From Swiss-Prot:
InterPro entries, sorted: Ribosomal_bL32, Ribosomal_bL32_bact, Ribosomal_zn-bd
Protein name: Large ribosomal subunit protein bL32
Gene of this entry: rpmF
Keywords: Ribonucleoprotein, Ribosomal protein
Membrane-spanning residues: none
Keyword Ribonucleoprotein applies: yes
PANTHER family, per the entry: 50S RIBOSOMAL PROTEIN L32, LARGE RIBOSOMAL SUBUNIT PROTEIN BL32
Lineage, uppermost ranks: Bacteria, Bacillati, Bacillota, Bacilli, Bacillales
Amino acid sequence: MAVPFRRTSKTRKRLRRTHFKLQVPGMVQCPNCGEWKLAHRVCKACGTYKGRDVVNK
């Protein structure tokens, strides 16, 4: 069975793992109420999207 010829250094191991991280969601403030919300989605607090009242109809 094959084994690694050299030990993997801390730096090389960490460089390989730089992409194994959680992505931060794109948060923006609602222009209507100022509440934080996910980008390109309806605001949960006031129910508006792109300046229009979507939920409370």
